[in-house]
């Protein structure tokens, strides 16, 4: 039976390295055949917003194509694809209360709405839990 890792993250996209670090940990766990639960709350519910768009960098004079600005929605979508390829589970819950406060409900495919009871259950059932707070 595969091991399970639960990660709780609250850092919004593009604010610090915390969300990127969380996604790298998730990626590494999935590649090792570990099931991963993600509980996104506070600003982290914006990591999966479908309406994110790459942008040019007018300071450097680069176009969207030249800038190749990644979006967190693409990173999260690639994690769901990786889980599928590896035959492991990625369960991503966006805190419904946090989503409602922010109007952040238009997500890519994969994440689902939930709340603290899922996190509580996951912490009890997981082999390890990592909490990545915001500053």
Q: What positions do the PLM features span?
A:
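A glycine-rich helix N-cap at a beta->alpha junction
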Residues: 56-94
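Extreme N-terminal starter segment of soluble prokaryotic enzymes
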Residues: 2-6
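C-terminal binding/interaction regions
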Residues: 102
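Short, hinge-like loop/turn segments at secondary-structure boundaries
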Residues: 54-58, 110-112
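Short, glycine-rich nucleotide/cofactor-binding loops
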Residues: 7-20, 36, 42, 47-52, ...
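Walker A/P-loop phosphate-binding motif and the immediately C-terminal alpha-helix
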Residues: 22-31
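Glycine-rich, aromatic-bearing surface loops/beta-hairpins
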Residues: 108, 117-135
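Short internal beta-strands
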Residues: 35-42, 92-96
């Amino acid at each position: 039976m595969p091991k399970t890792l639960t990660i709780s993250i609250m850092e919004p996209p593009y604010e610090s390295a915390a969300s990127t670090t969380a996604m790298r940990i998730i990626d590494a766990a999935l590649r090792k055949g570990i099931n991963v639960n993600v509980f996104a709350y506070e600003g982290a519910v914006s990591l999966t917003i479908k309406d994110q768009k790459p942008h040019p960098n007018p300071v450097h004079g680069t176009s969207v194509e030249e800038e190749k600005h990644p979006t967190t929605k693409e990173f999260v979508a690639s994690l769901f694809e990786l889980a599928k390829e590896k035959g492991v589970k990625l369960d991503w819950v966006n805190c419904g209360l946090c989503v409602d406060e922010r109007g952040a409900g238009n997500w890519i495919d994969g994440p689902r709405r939930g709340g603290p009871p899922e996190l509580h259950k996951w912490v009890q059932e997981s082999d390890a839990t990592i909490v990545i707070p915001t500053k």
